[in-house]
């Protein structure tokens, strides 16, 4: 019998991001209860030795599964060390991979308190409008003029700690140059 290969898209991330992601998920699952029905699977609950953890996020009748891996191919730098994450959408027996932006949008629409375009209609009709959004990155598209006006009126309140974001987990910070503040007293930073 021949070998059967299975290809999986895995975003390479550093170990600290995996720790931060797991910490945020556990905080909002057990402390704030915003993610109370999310399921967290530890590495010892998986049959795959490369799986570090898996978070099952129910969205309607399906699940978004965010799986973190360890012990993958070594990265270009020491901090890469072969950690990665994959994101799947599962409905019964059907599975497909999705990108982090789509996953965040689906999670945002289902879990986070948010004013949406329906808030414009509610405001015009004089009904009560939810005045906050816990995940502003979910509104990355250009909105209507009324929606932008409503966003201008609503005060932004930051959550401490932030809600878990798949997009933030997979963002590529390695290829972006580091921004180091130039301090007058620091000679080692600017080479003088």
Curated annotation (Swiss-Prot):
Family of the protein in this entry: Belongs to the primate lentivirus group Vif protein family.
Role, per record: Counteracts the innate antiviral activity of host APOBEC3F and APOBEC3G by promoting their ubiquitination and degradation. Acts as a substrate recognition component of an E3 ubiquitin-protein ligase complex: mechanistically, Vif hijacks a host cullin-5-RING E3 ubiquitin-protein ligase complex (ECS complex) and the transcription coactivator CBFB/CBF-beta to form an active E3 ubiquitin-protein ligase complex that targets APOBEC3G and APOBEC3F for polyubiquitination, leading to their degradation by the proteasome.
Residues where Phosphothreonine is found: 96
Assembly mode: Homomultimer; in vitro and presumably in vivo. Interacts with viral RNA and Pr55Gag precursor; these interactions mediate Vif incorporation into the virion. Interacts with the viral reverse transcriptase. Forms cullin-5-RING E3 ubiquitin-protein ligase complex (ECS complex) by interacting with host CUL5, RBX2, elongin BC complex (ELOB and ELOC) and CBFB/CBF-beta. Within the ECS complex, Vif interacts directly with host CUL5, ELOC and APOBEC (APOBEC3F and APOBEC3G) substrates.
Keyword tRNA-binding: no
Cleavage in virion (by viral protease), annotated site positions: 150-151
UniProt-annotated stretches for the region Interaction with host APOBEC3F: 14-17, 74-79
Topological category with respect to the lipid bilayer: Peripheral membrane protein
Motif (BC-box-like motif): 144-153
Protein name as annotated: Virion infectivity factor
Remaining remarks: Vif-defective viruses show catastrophic failure in reverse transcription due to APOBEC-induced mutations that initiate a DNA base repair pathway and compromise the structural integrity of the ssDNA. In the absence of Vif, the virion is morphologically abnormal. HIV-1 lineages are divided in three main groups, M (for Major), O (for Outlier), and N (for New, or Non-M, Non-O). The vast majority of strains found worldwide belong to the group M. Group O seems to be endemic to and largely confined to Cameroon and neighboring countries in West Central Africa, where these viruses represent a small minority of HIV-1 strains. The group N is represented by a limited number of isolates from Cameroonian persons. The group M is further subdivided in 9 clades or subtypes (A to D, F to H, J and K).
Inducing or repressing factors: Expressed late during infection in a Rev-dependent manner.
Region (Multimerization): 151-164
Gene: vif
Gene Ontology biological process terms from the UniProt entry: viral life cycle
């Amino acid at each position: 019998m021949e070998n059967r290969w299975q290809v999986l898209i895995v975003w390479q991330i550093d170990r600290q991001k995996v720790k931060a992601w797991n910490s945020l998920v556990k905080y909002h699952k057990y402390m704030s209860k915003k993610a109370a029905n999310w399921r967290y699977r530890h590495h010892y609950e998986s049959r795959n030795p490369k799986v570090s953890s898996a978070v099952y996020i129910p969205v309607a009748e399906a699940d978004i599964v965010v799986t973190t891996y360890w012990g993958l191919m070594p990265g270009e730098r020491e901090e890469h060390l072969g950690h990665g994450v994959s994101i799947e959408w599962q409905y019964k027996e059907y599975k497909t991979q999705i990108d982090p932006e789509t996953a965040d949008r689906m999670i945002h629409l289902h879990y986070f308190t948010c004013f949406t375009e329906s808030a414009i209609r509610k405001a015009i009709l004089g009904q009560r409008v939810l005045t906050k959004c816990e995940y502003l990155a979910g509104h990355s598209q250009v909105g209507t003029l009324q929606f932008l006006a409503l966003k201008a009126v609503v005060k932004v309140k930051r959550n401490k700690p932030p809600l878990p974001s798949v997009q933030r987990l997979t963002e590529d910070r390695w290829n972006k140059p580091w921004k180091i503040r130039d301090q007058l007293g620091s000679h080692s930073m600017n080479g003088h």
